[in-house]
Design a protein with these regions (language model features):
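S-adenosyl-L-methionine
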Residues: 2-54
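C-terminal substrate-binding/active-site "lid" region of AdoMet-derived donor-dependent transferases
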Residues: 8-14, 18, 59-123
Length: 124
C-alpha cells in the first residue's frame, strides 16, 4: 500500500502486520519511478485518490498489475474538473480506459452514498 501521508502509513503498517500480503510504502503514487524497485507484480490494484490526474496515475501504476489481474479505480469527478457534469467525466474515463485496451468488467456511480463518485473494476 502506498500513501504520501505518514499518519495514514502508520495505520497501514499495523494492518500489514496482520495481513502479510501488504507492504506499506511512503511515497507519492503519481511517481511510480520513485518506488518501482520496491514493488513486485500484484494480483489486485486499488486506487482511491483525489487528484486531477487520477486516471493517468492509475495507468502509470498498472505496470505493477499481473496479466489477468484485477484493478479497482475510484474516480472523484469534482477532483478532476468542477465545471463539468460528473457523468461526462465518467464517460471520458471509460473511453480512455478502452483506448488503452483496458477491459472494463463493471463500473458504477456511487450516488447516493458518495456524490459525484464512480468506481471501475478492470482486468489487465
Amino acid at each position: 500500500g502506498i500513501d504520501i501521508a505518514p499518519r495514514v502509513l502508520r495505520q497501514l503498517f499495523f494492518l500489514a502486520y496482520d495481513r502479510r500480503n501488504i507492504a506499506p510504502i511512503l511515497a507519492d503514487c503519481a511517481h511510480p519511478e520513485e518506488y518501482d524497485y520496491r514493488i513486485c507484480m500484484c494480483d489486485f490494484l486499488i486506487q482511491d485518490i483525489a487528484q486531477k490526474g487520477q486516471l493517468e496515475i492509475f495507468l502509470k501504476n498498472l505496470k505493477f498489475l499481473k496479466p489477468g489481474g484485477t484493478g479497482f479505480l475510484a474516480i472523484k469527478a469534482r477532483s478532476i474538473d468542477v465545471t463539468k457534469p460528473p457523468y461526462k467525466i465518467f464517460e471520458q474515463v471509460k473511453k480512455q480506459l478502452e483506448e488503452n485496451k483496458i477491459k472494463i468488467i463493471d463500473y458504477k456511480t456511487l450516488d447516493p452514498f458518495e456524490k459525484d463518485h464512480c468506481v471501475f473494476v478492470i482486468q489487465k
